[in-house]
């Protein structure tokens, strides 16, 4: 019986794996079995760390905002509370960028919002 040569499909599949793993080191980029295992591990790590990256950046932004507001005698929680009361929809990223580039600007915004909220509170109680 004649030996059947395999078609191009398996070779094409392996080529895709090798292209994905071409930057891996050692046998992880050369051997088929370890390449497939490393590809699966890499994809699992990428999926897991996408969520982790969002958490880490949010924590970093909160830390930066808190550092600048505490320098000026405020606190992060008070700033966020004032933002919500003033109906200013800002995510954590924008105030964090303001805190890095110009901390005084963030301080002025927080003071302005705080004073505006106090005036609104007085007028509604009268």
Swiss-Prot record:
MF (Gene Ontology): rRNA binding; structural constituent of ribosome
GO CC annotations on file: chloroplast; ribonucleoprotein complex; ribosome
Superkingdom, taxonomy of origin: Eukaryota
GO biological process terms on file: ribosomal large subunit assembly; translation
Subcellular compartments: Plastid, Chloroplast
Primary location class: plastid
Keyword annotations from UniProtKB, A to Z: Chloroplast, Plastid, Ribonucleoprotein, Ribosomal protein, RNA-binding, rRNA-binding
PANTHER family listed in its UniProt record: 39S RIBOSOMAL PROTEIN L20
Similarity comment: family membership: Belongs to the bacterial ribosomal protein bL20 family.
Function, as annotated: Binds directly to 23S ribosomal RNA and is necessary for the in vitro assembly process of the 50S ribosomal subunit. It is not involved in the protein synthesizing functions of that subunit.
The protein's name in its UniProt record: Large ribosomal subunit protein bL20c
Organism: Illicium oligandrum (Star anise)
Lineage, top ranks: Eukaryota, Viridiplantae, Streptophyta, Embryophyta, Tracheophyta
């Amino acid at each position: 019986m004649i030996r059947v040569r395999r078609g191009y499909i398996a070779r094409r599949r392996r080529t895709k794996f090798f292209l994905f793993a071409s930057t891996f080191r050692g046998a992880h980029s050369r051997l088929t079995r370890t390449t497939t295992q490393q590809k699966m591990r890499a994809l699992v790590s990428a999926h897991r760390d996408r969520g982790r990256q969002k958490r880490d950046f949010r924590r970093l932004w909160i830390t930066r905002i808190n550092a600048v507001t505490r320098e000026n005698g405020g606190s992060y929680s008070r700033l966020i509370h004032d933002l919500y009361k003033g109906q200013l929809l800002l995510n954590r990223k924008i105030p964090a960028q303001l805190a890095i580039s110009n901390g005084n600007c963030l301080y002025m915004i927080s003071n302005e919002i705080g004073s505006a909220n106090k005036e609104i509170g007085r007028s509604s109680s009268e």
